[in-house]
Amino acid sequence: MLTGLLIGTSYIPFPPWALLFCHVPLWIFWLREGSIRRVLWGGWLAQFLFCLIGFHWVAYTAHEFGQMPWPLALLVLLLFCAFGHLYLVLAGLSWAILRDRLGLGRTQQLLLLPVVTAIFHRYVPLIFPWNLGYPWLWARLPAFQLAEFVGFDGLGVLTLFLNLALLAAWERRKERAGALILGGTAAFLLLFNWAGWAAGRGQPVPDAEARVLVVQGNVGNFEKIYAEKGLGFRDDVVGRYFRLTAQGLRRAGERAPDFVVWPETAFPEVIRADRMDAEYTGALRSFVRIGNVALVTGAIGHDEAKRKPTNAMFFFDRDGTLR
């Protein structure tokens, strides 16, 4: 349970306060357990809890966008938590089988823990992929710059081995070796973050920049549905985005943006290349021309091959031309 709580409360959007030891309680449990069944149960419980904390928004998504009643949306969340991250269960199973079949010693068991965890996290499919490398960036720890060389997957694997180092220090806590391992880990962290800082300082100065105005209309989901189906709200939604964009352009003054971005499905009309003068699409093109600014917007498009509407993104040039 403790590992589930530590991972869940150390991942984005929380500060990574337990990132370097979040797996330690689960690994200690695995090391102490001789029963494969209990190893599996420990892994499942840990993944269930961190799913419940980190992916609680699944219930809201099912309710808001799936239009499910709250009891059913909560059931969807519980089902996701039960099966969403079985990589931890499979890692525990593999570790226990290898331990028993090969008769591994204590040191070998310890080294195997981050290896199987990293392998199964990498190769077991996840509905929402994530890894332990991203919190380095979220917390702006200098070491995140090293993702340029090892990737965030690499940072995630390194984080698992740092968990192993702290586990080893805990195992030897009554010996001088424990203090040495702990001190060595702290020194490595300082060196690693210094290397990240140096890598960041060594980045070349950008040779170009783009100024972007991002507009969020905060349109409710049901308003979008009604607008897209032509049941009302279109004038209000379009007017809201026009108004907010115009305000942003005025505030920008001389630092005019290179282009404006509207979010997914912001524009409440199907945009088709053969109907560019349709009521709202025509108004949109006129707005772009008058504002003299390029626009990237999410909207409903039309898949000509399948003859079906599709979620799409459109780019309008300053003269209102669809690119």
What residue spans do the PLM features occupy?
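Membrane-embedded alpha-helical bundles of multi-pass enzymes
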Residues: 1-200
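Soluble catalytic regions of membrane-associated enzymes that act on cell-envelope
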Residues: 196-323
